[in-house]
Amino acid sequence: MASLKSIKKRIVSVKNTRQITKAMKMVSAAKLRRAQENVVAARPYAKKLGEVLQRLAKSQDESGSPLMQQRLSQKALLIVVTSDRGLCGGFNANICKAAERFIKEKKAEFAEISVTTVGRKGYEFLKNRQKIHKNYGNVLANLSYPAAALLAQEMIEGYIAEEYDEVYILFNAFKSVMSQDITLEKLLPIAPEAASTEEYAPEYIYEPSKGELLAELLPKHIEVQVFKALLESVASEHGARMTAMDSASKNATEMIGKLTLQYNRARQAAITTELMEIISGAESIKG
């Protein structure tokens, strides 16, 4: 049986760990609230912009914008969004595995698949497994629209220069604290959705022309989609870390209980042994 001193040392160590996990849970909860508010605010804007773009795109020839042109798909770019830090359960591992599945499934379709990573964990996992086109580090800690727009603009420039023919983004979409959905979205080329099935579709008067608006809104649409995906990932990360730290704290409490019971039994056994020795010694003196 382990000594009383070693058991007590383990109890102190686990208690210290529990303090850390509880603190991390509280920090993640505070960050999650802010991140969740950002996601909720971004979703309606992204949806409405997509609707406006859809109306414009339906009445335009796709050859009018390079971002809508369908061409022979030979090269693809996959943007993989993970976190910069760990201790968030399977958040990063699940995304990285999904990225590997995508690459494996699309190998026959594309001659070349490049990967852009957002977040240190994804880069560290994929750098020895796949060609990394670029890594964006330290973007998510203080996420801003200009940072997301820069990523989107560099991606658009590469697409126009025909460095790749299709662009996808893979991220964790935020559903709830306990649930994050791995989501794959195709960013480029932009395909106008099928015409509305509604009997009455209102006509809009656009100023300036539809072509000018489309040229302005297409890049903006990509920027917004990238920004929303990053916001979703940040909220998902905090939710996953909060859940993981809560689970770790509960496990630590359970372990402390088991170690305390073990300590009490060991202490009781030691006291019993001492008493037996005292009694034996007393009997020897009497004899």
Swiss-Prot record:
GO terms for molecular function: ATP binding; proton-transporting ATP synthase activity, rotational mechanism. GO terms for biological process: proton motive force-driven ATP synthesis; proton motive force-driven plasma membrane ATP synthesis. It comes from the Bacteria. Keywords: ATP synthesis, Cell inner membrane, Cell membrane, CF(1), Hydrogen ion transport, Ion transport, Membrane, Transport. GO terms for cellular component: plasma membrane; proton-transporting ATP synthase complex. Belongs to the ATPase gamma chain family. SUPFAM superfamilies: ATP synthase (F1-ATPase), gamma subunit (SSF52943). The keyword Transcription does not apply. It comes from Geobacter sulfurreducens (strain ATCC 51573 / DSM 12127 / PCA). InterPro entries: ATP_synth_F1_ATPase_gsu, ATP_synth_F1_gsu, ATP_synth_F1_gsu_CS. Its main location: membrane. It is a peripheral membrane protein. This is ATP synthase gamma chain. Produces ATP from ADP in the presence of a proton gradient across the membrane. The gamma chain is believed to be important in regulating ATPase activity and the flow of protons through the CF(0) complex. It holds the Pfam family ATP-synt.
